[in-house]
From Swiss-Prot:
Coiled-coil ranges from the UniProt annotation: none
Name of the featured protein: Phenylalanine dehydrogenase
Biotechnological exploitation: Phenylalanine dehydrogenase (PheDH) is a key enzyme in medical diagnostic for determining the amount of phenylalanine to detect phenylketonuria (PKU) disease. The mutant V144L has a higher specificity for phenylalanine substrate and may provide a suitable candidate to increase the specificity of PKU detection in clinic.
Family: Belongs to the Glu/Leu/Phe/Val dehydrogenases family.
Catalytic activity: L-phenylalanine + NAD(+) + H2O = 3-phenylpyruvate + NH4(+) + NADH + H(+)
Designated gene of the protein: pdh
Annotated binding of L-phenylalanine, by residue: K78, N276
Function: Catalyzes the reversible NAD(+)-dependent oxidative deamination of L-phenylalanine to phenylpyruvate. Is also able to act on L-tyrosine, but with 100-fold lower efficiency.
Residues passing through the membrane, by range: none
Naturally occurring in which organism (per UniProt): Bacillus badius
Pathway annotation: Amino-acid biosynthesis; L-phenylalanine biosynthesis; L-phenylalanine from phenylpyruvate (PDH route): step 1/1
Active-site residues, record numbering mapped to chain: K90 (proton donor/acceptor)
EC annotation from Swiss-Prot or TrEMBL: 1.4.1.20
């Protein structure tokens, strides 16, 4: 056996080691459009895989694969925690979203998604938007987060923000014995589509906010909003948000915000927000517990949007979405109580609850093969 052959076998073995927890990984290549993408299906015990598609100029295929594998596994737990009948998946497109997009590229991507026969449903994520997926929808009906004009649920930031507020209410219940949002001080990092709605909801209940955002107009808007409520807003610098004398830190921007540096600065009693992957490592969940800071697992708190897009695949029913989103309150309380009872971190408690649900379903159905059929189909 030649050195080249040995090297190839080692690389193949390493690849299978990396995806050992996953059911399926699809490498998509279309030279005509320049499409290079990876679709990772982690687990379909609960139903077809569901997860967004992001587009980034990854430095290597290996980096893109790592992202797809990590994010798809996270979606499995998020779906299980949200009590929706879907498993975890994720797609990544290798390319610069500012330069490399084209209608043809997303139609090619749609063809690859459709080839999976309903095992994977996807929609927008970092670097992609609904305009991109209107093109993909010409090749597949396995697209979620569809605009209302196409029969979808519309803006998913609304139920996402609502879920965050329910998560905060549950956190306040655990901290103070009552779930009122008003009369509590919050430090909100990020006033994007979700963060701004969360801030509005808290202000309307009479909360006191420290806020930071890179957009000056957004900061001015939330200060104007505060004038119409019994709440108040104080704008702080981005690097000062972690050290505010607040009750609850509400991260609504980016991940990894609970790390060695911020741990030294936190003066809050709890953390509950919409940002994904807030803990830089699992160890930081333990560090928070040791410091007496209550942590609301992000993938439960921010699951309102997922609940809506999962609901789309059957028939949009906003009342049903609202009712399911309200259960985030109960889920977070259950996590807190279980963590306290078992003397484990809240993240460990949340993961354990999800694994128990998957194990129970796995005794009846361990592999999803048939397709859910959404009502829209604009394929040519």
């Amino acid at each position: 056996m030649s050195l080249v052959e040995k090297t190839s076998i080692i690389k193949d073995f390493t690849l299978f080691e990396k995806m050992s927890e996953h059911e399926q990984v699809v490498f998509c290549n279309d030279p005509a459009t320049g499409l290079r993408a990876i679709i990772a299906i982690h687990d379909t015990t609960l139903g077809p895989a569901l997860g967004g598609c992001r587009m980034q100029p990854y430095n290597s295929v290996e980096e893109a694969l790592e992202d797809a594998l990590r994010l798809s596994k996270g979606m499995t737990y998020k779906c299980a925690a949200s009590d929706v009948d879907f498993g975890g998946g994720k797609a990544v497109i290798i390319g610069d979203p500012q330069k490399d997009k084209s209608p043809e590229l997303f139609r090619a991507f749609g063809q690859f998604v459709d080839s999976l026969g309903g095992r994977f449903y996807t929609g927008t994520d970092m670097g992609t938007n609904m305009e991109d997926f209107i093109h993909a929808m010409k090749e597949t009906n396995c697209i979620v987060g569809v605009p209302e004009a196409y029969g979808g649920g519309g803006d998913s930031s609304i139920p996402t923000a609502m879920g965050v507020l329910y998560g905060i209410k549950a956190t306040n219940k655990m901290l103070f014995g009552k779930d009122d949002l008003g009369g509590v001080t919050y430090a909100i990092q990020g006033l994007g589509k979700v963060g701004y709605k969360v801030a509005e909801g808290l202000l309307e209940e009479g909360a006191h906010l420290f806020v930071t955002d890179i957009n000056e107009q957004t900061l001015e808007a939330i200060q104007e909003k505060a004038k119409t409520t019994s709440g108040s807003v104080t704008v702080v610098a981005s690097d000062e948000i972690y050290s505010q004398e607040a009750d609850v830190f509400v991260p609504c921007a980016f991940g990894g915000v609970v790390n060695d540096e911020t741990m030294k600065q936190f003066k809050v009693k709890a953390i509950a927000g919409s940002a994904n992957n807030q803990l830089l490592t699992e160890d930081h969940g333990r560090h928070l517990a040791d410091k007496g800071i209550l942590y609301a697992p992000d993938y439960i708190v921010n699951s309102g949007g997922l609940i809506q897009v999962a609901d789309e695949l059957y028939e949009v029913n906003k009342e049903r979405v609202l009712a399911k989103t309200k259960h985030i309150y109960d889920a977070i309380l259950e996590v807190y109580q279980q963590a306290e009872l078992d003397q484990i971190t809240t993240m460990e408690a949340a993961n354990r609850m999800c694994e128990q649900r998957m194990a129970a379903r796995g005794r009846r159905n361990s592999f999803f093969t048939s397709s859910v059929k959404p009502k829209w189909d604009i394929r040519n």
